């Protein structure tokens, strides 16, 4: 409940409520009780993480498939049991079943080994249903919420009702209960207040996140903290203007996106000239950087998707169940909970078939306890906490992953195969095609000469790998 409360406050309101779990906020006008008043909106929530979210037709197909697998598993297991029974029946003295392998002939051992291998393959071939997290209200089981002394559940103090931050809304709100509804209306009341003009935070927080996504820096540099300890807005009038535009347009995100990308600010170059750098030094780095797109590396997801796209490996799809990537043994060993054979979908790890792995990163499963190693190398944040702004590091493992990783190597091989199929004999055309496919431009004279020299002793695959490792490919300009 604390995570839910604090994530809602940070993501939607730009407020840090973690301090208020134990005491009044040290800097912001948020009281100890405000945390628990906000938490009370979720008091009637119940969770279920074993609800199948596949389409009914898909669920039926999965169950039919698993029934066939179970029948085959039963058949193979029966053949193993029969061999063991035959071995035990030959003995003149009673032998424990677990020692039957010691008494088998070489032929019987081979038969059992083959059957056990088939059994393991059949078990791996079973397809689990895709489970989702479901949240719902129960009218008859609303737990009272108490202010906890120092955040300790063993020392409850005063009971509280659902309420918004008291600095803005000191009175207890009237809960909205839909007609003929069996829910409490608490979450609906909170949602309506968040998306209303009575709430001065949500619109600012949303437009600031959109601005940050385009320019690399938000108008407020701390997107999850609009309080006293957070950064001041570099251009408060701009922030309020965009917030008003969002509300006046009926909370249309499309309108804000269009407003930003059609502005002259968005059309500025990423790299500034010498005079502009001098202006930056006099006006302050963040204030200047806010109004110009920053040269920055693509996010982990963007970089992976770009590699798959330029190589032609990307599987275009819209919607569908998540894809479970293949993880190395070291990653799985570091998370023993996912290796439990009896675990449910939310606890285990079930790699999808190789033919389904090259989808957009949007469709890769995300678990709180595990980060995909390749993407973690490129600063994929932890899944357990809300991340307002990603850090961008430059470390050696990133270069190694791009140069030696299976994703980059496989992509370079596919690009080279495609080019050789189109222009098998002309190295000049191969160079131009590689540049156009990977960097979306032709090489200049110096680059072309260097590539010609490179191909005299190296392969086209290696040239494609080099182009995938350029800053021009990995960075957004």
Predicted regions and their residues:
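Extracellular structured ligand-interaction cores
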Residues: 5, 35, 187, 304, ...
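Sequence context surrounding c-type heme c attachment/ligation sites in exported
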Residues: 1-70, 375, 387
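C-terminal or internal capping secondary-structure element at the end of a domain, subdomain, or sheet
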Residues: 465-466
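Primarily short, surface-exposed interaction patches in extracytoplasmic proteins
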Residues: 1, 29, 68-356, 381-393, ...
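A structural supersecondary motif
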Residues: 365-368, 376-386
């Amino acid at each position: 409940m604390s995570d839910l409360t604090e994530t809602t406050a940070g993501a939607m309101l730009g407020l840090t409520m973690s301090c208020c779990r134990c005491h009044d906020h040290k800097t912001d006008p948020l009281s100890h009780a405000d945390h628990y008043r906000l938490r009370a909106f979720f008091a009637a929530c119940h969770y279920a993480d074993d609800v199948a979210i596949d389409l009914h037709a898909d669920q039926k197909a999965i169950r039919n498939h698993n029934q066939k697998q179970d029948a085959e598993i039963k058949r193979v297991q029966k053949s193993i049991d029969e061999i063991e029974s035959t071995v035990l029946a030959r003995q003149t003295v009673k032998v424990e079943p677990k020692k039957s392998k010691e008494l088998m002939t070489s032929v019987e051992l081979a038969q059992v080994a083959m059957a056990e291998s088939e059994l393991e393959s059949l078990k791996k071939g079973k397809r689990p249903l895709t489970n989702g997290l479901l949240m719902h209200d129960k009218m008859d089981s609303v737990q009272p919420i108490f202010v906890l002394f120092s955040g300790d559940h063993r020392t409850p103090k005063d009971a509280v009702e659902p309420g918004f931050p008291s600095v803005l809304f000191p009175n207890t709100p009237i809960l909205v209960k839909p007609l003929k509804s069996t829910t409490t209306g608490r979450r609906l009341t909170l949602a309506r207040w968040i998306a209303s003009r009575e709430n001065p935070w949500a619109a600012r927080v949303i437009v600031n996140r959109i601005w940050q996504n385009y320019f690399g820096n938000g108008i407020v540099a701390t997107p999850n903290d609009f309080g006293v300890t957070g950064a001041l807005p570099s251009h408060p009038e701009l922030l309020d203007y965009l917030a008003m535009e969002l509300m006046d347009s009926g909370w249309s995100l499309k309108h804000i996106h269009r407003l930003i990308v059609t502005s002259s600010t968005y059309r500025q170059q990423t790299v500034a000239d010498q005079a502009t750098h001098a202006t930056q030094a006099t006006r302050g780095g963040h204030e200047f950087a806010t109004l110009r797109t920053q040269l920055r590396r693509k996010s982990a997801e963007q970089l992976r998707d770009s590699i798959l796209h330029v190589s032609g490996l990307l599987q275009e799809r819209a919607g569908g169940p998540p894809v479970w990537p293949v993880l190395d043994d070291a990653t799985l060993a570091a998370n023993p909970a996912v290796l439990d054979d009896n675990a449910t979908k939310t606890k285990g790890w079930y790699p999808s078939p190789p033919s389904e792995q090259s989808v957009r990163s949007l469709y890769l499963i995300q678990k709180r306890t595990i980060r995909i190693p390749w993407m973690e190398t490129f600063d994929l944040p932890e899944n357990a906490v809300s991340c307002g702004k990603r850090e961008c590091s430059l470390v050696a493992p990133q270069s190694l992953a791009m140069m030696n990783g299976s994703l980059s190597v496989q992509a370079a091989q596919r690009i080279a195969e495609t080019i050789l199929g189109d222009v098998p004999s002309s190295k000049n055309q191969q160079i131009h095609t590689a540049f156009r496919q990977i960097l979306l431009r032709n090489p200049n004279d110096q680059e072309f000469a260097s590539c010609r020299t490179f191909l005299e002793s190296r392969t086209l695959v290696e040239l494609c790998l080099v182009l995938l490792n350029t800053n021009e490919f990995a960075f957004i300009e």
